[in-house]
From Swiss-Prot:
Pathway: Nucleotide-sugar biosynthesis; UDP-N-acetyl-alpha-D-glucosamine biosynthesis; N-acetyl-alpha-D-glucosamine 1-phosphate from alpha-D-glucosamine 6-phosphate (route II): step 2/2; Nucleotide-sugar biosynthesis; UDP-N-acetyl-alpha-D-glucosamine biosynthesis; UDP-N-acetyl-alpha-D-glucosamine from N-acetyl-alpha-D-glucosamine 1-phosphate: step 1/1; Bacterial outer membrane biogenesis; LPS lipid A biosynthesis. Its EC number is 2.7.7.23, 2.3.1.157. Binds 1 Mg(2+) ion per subunit. It comes from the Bacteria. Its cofactor is Mg(2+). This is Bifunctional protein GlmU. Residues 1-223 are annotated as: Pyrophosphorylase. Residues 224-244 are annotated as: Linker.
């Protein structure tokens, strides 16, 4: 059976205390809604997101990553609530899976289990450790009789610990039947999608409870829950890579984006941050290093090194306080205190302490090319664009502003001068 997915993301998210919409708050360097969409598209080719607050901003972010997504705008003023969000929605498939836009930990397997349950109407539920403000599920022989919102629950209903996750799978035809019947005669004066349960039951449909893990379906409403969700996601990401052979030293101190890929035997030390679509192949990343959207193969990086986007390292050593950006390094040693930006450096070359590729002229970026077996002395500046051929020696303290031919020694220093007794003259001693 094909499934349509509808994601409710129109809420104001006031508890986030942010000018950005709640669903654009970042978890593991990515907007919360994108984590949900990634899972949704694993089970469906028809995904629609309901928006209202800062609609255009959210649409732009979503379409950059998932261009086939449909959108529906909710009229919050006249039709608030989860059922109000569905006004005007048309499903492309026989069954609709409805979930919230603040559930970044949901997995496609669980969503599919809920959607493909044989019942006409399924509700994902969990046993809550602390029911808090969750809607309570009234069950009879594992069939749902009704869902009661906390605001409207009596003392007996509040004692129930089986709670509504906010995820539903319902046949599109049933949805069309019951939606027009939902009223806002409750304390909040909202149109509750939970009312669809008793309305469907009145029409003779059975509503099944599908039990799920509370943690995987947690909603993120404030910065505390945002932090908790990220911690849980980080833990899951690192556990999965450890199962595949990656060694993490003090994993609680490291940050790994969900798009990072490890291949072969890799080792990651404490306080490391690896972001974006980085790929680490048979390499060691030492303490307090940051890697962004870069490829590291058969290399060691750090400690205290920074690879900015578009770096490609192979058989290379990058030491402490070395920053690279858009650098192609093959068989290179850069031990300490250097900036290597917009450059290509070939195998056997050694980059001395304090080397800088001066890549920016105030308007455009320029490239530095360094060939094989080049020895670069300490405190060297390359004024790009510049090309250094193979087997060149650059003397320490040089400012390289022209191309250097193969086998040459390049020296460019200010002429030394010693003025006798200058100290005494200056300070009149």
């Amino acid at each position: 059976m094909k499934i349509s997915v509808l994601i409710l993301a129109a809420g104001l998210g006031t508890r986030m205390k942010s000018q950005n919409p709640k669903v654009l708050q970042k978890i593991c360097s990515k907007a919360m809604i994108l984590h949900i969409l990634k899972q949704a598209y694993k089970i469906s080719d028809d995904v629609c997101v309901v928006l209202s607050h800062q609609k255009e901003k959210v649409e732009q972010v979503i379409l950059e990553h998932f261009p086939n997504t449909r959108f529906l705008e909710q009229d919050l003023q006249n039709f608030p609530g989860t059922a109000g969000a569905l006004r005007g929605y048309e499903s492309k498939h026989e069954k609709v899976l409805i979930l919230c836009g603040d559930m970044p930990l949901v997995k496609a397997d669980d969503l599919e289990k809920i959607a493909l349950n044989e019942s006409d109407f399924n509700v994902a539920v969990f046993k809550a450790k602390d029911p808090k403000s969750y809607g309570r599920i009234v069950l009879k022989e594992n069939k749902i009789q009704k869902i009661v919102e906390t605001k409207d629950a009596n003392k007996e209903e509040l004692a129930i610990n089986i709670c509504n996750s906010g995820v539903y799978a319902i046949k599109a035809q049933i949805l069309k039947e019951v939606l027009p019947l939902i009223k806002n005669d409750n304390k909040a004066k909202e149109y509750y999608l939970t009312d669809a349960v008793y309305l469907a039951k009145e029409k003779g449909y059975e509503i099944d409870a599908v039990f799920v893990n509370e943690q995987d379906f947690m909603g993120v409403n404030d910065k505390i829950e945002l932090c908790l969700a990220q911690d849980l996601m980080q833990e899951a990401i690192k556990k999965e890579w450890m199962k595949q052979g990656v060694i993490f030293h003090m994993p609680a101190t490291t940050f790994i984006s969900d798009e990072v890929e490890f291949v072969g035997e890799c080792e990651v030390y404490e306080n490391v941050r690896i972001e974006g679509k980085s790929k680490i192949i048979n390499s060691i990343i030492k303490s307090s290093s940051v890697i962004e959207d870069s490829i590291v193969e058969n290399s060691d990086v750090g400690p205290l090194a920074h690879l900015r986007p578009k770096c490609q390292l192979k058989n290379t050593h990058i030491g402490n306080f070395v920053e690279c950006k858009n650098a192609l390094l093959n068989g290179v040693k850069a031990g300490h205190l250097s900036y290597l930006g917009d450059c290509e450096i070939d195998e056997g070359s050694n980059i001395g302490c304090g080397t800088i590729t001066c890549n920016y002229d105030g308007v455009k970026k320029h490239k530095t090319k360094i060939g094989k077996n080049v020895f670069v002395g300490s405190d060297t500046q390359f004024i790009a664009p510049v090309n250094i051929e193979d087997e060149v020696i650059i003397a320490a303290g040089s400012c390289v502003n022209k191309d250097v031919k193969k086998g040459s020694l390049f020296i460019n220093r200010a002429k030394e001068e010693i003025i006798k007794d200058y100290f005494y003259t200056k300070f009149k001693k």
